[in-house]
Regions:
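A short amphipathic beta-strand at an alpha->beta junction
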Residues: 71-72, 165
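Short, glycine/acidic-rich beta->alpha junctions
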Residues: 69-71, 148-149
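Acyl-donor binding region in acyl/amide transferases
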Residues: 61, 98-182
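Conserved N-terminal entry element of GNAT/NAT acetyltransferase domains
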Residues: 1-37
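Generic detection of long, well-ordered alpha-helical segments
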Residues: 2-6, 36-47, 143, 147
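Short beta->alpha transition motifs characteristic of CBS
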Residues: 91-97
């Protein structure tokens, strides 16, 4: 799959700058948090880069792009490099207070992996589900990208204080030994 149209991505990022979607800025980096509907081209590129990055470590969906139904209604936090006009990394983040009323427990990606007892439903309403995180290869050895994404998580929790919990699944690459994975 070809990369998303860069001019359209830049236009979407510029619109986000004019709204309340920028969480933070540090030198040439900006971290944004927004809905999928506001970033169709950026989201396409997130899906493409997610697949490329996961394949590089023996993971991935084996599809041309890694997007699923959850990407359409989850929020996306992404790290934008102003110097290169590209996405350096991203997280998918679902706000439980929005997901649960619309979709119930079935609306959470984690429900595909685990069975949630009804006693946990209130917790899920007050949770931010995180996942599908990546940093593209060119930025993985740089000190700031991971730090800024984590700082973006902090800013998100401050912006949405009704969410008391962060949760999500973690994939551990098969490149690690069984001992390391245990």
């Amino acid at each position: 799959v070809t990369a998303a149209n860069q001019e359209k991505m830049i236009a979407e990022v510029n619109k986000l700058r004019d709204s309340d979607s920028r969480l933070l800025q540090s030198k040439n980096y900006e971290v944004f948090f927004t809905e999928a509907s506001k970033i169709p081209n950026v989201l396409h590129e997130i899906g493409r880069l997610r697949e490329v990055t996961f394949r590089e470590v023996g993971e991935g969906t084996n599809e041309s792009i890694d997007l699923d139904k959850y990407d359409q209604y989850y929020h996306h936090m992404f790290l934008w490099d102003d110097e290169t006009n590209q996405i350096a990394g991203a997280y998918r983040m679902g706000l439980g207070s929005e997901i649960f009323p619309k979709y119930g427990i079935e609306g959470f990606y984690l429900n595909d992996l685990f069975r949630f007892e009804s006693e946990l439903h209130d917790m899920m309403k007050n949770s931010i589900e995180m996942g599908r995180a990546f940093i593209i290869k060119e930025y993985q050895q740089k000190p700031m990208p991971l730090f800024l994404l984590w700082k973006g998580i902090i800013h998100t929790t401050l912006r949405y204080p009704e969410h008391k919990y962060l949760l999500g699944g973690v994939s551990i690459s098969n490149q690690f030994s069984n001992f390391s994975k245990s």
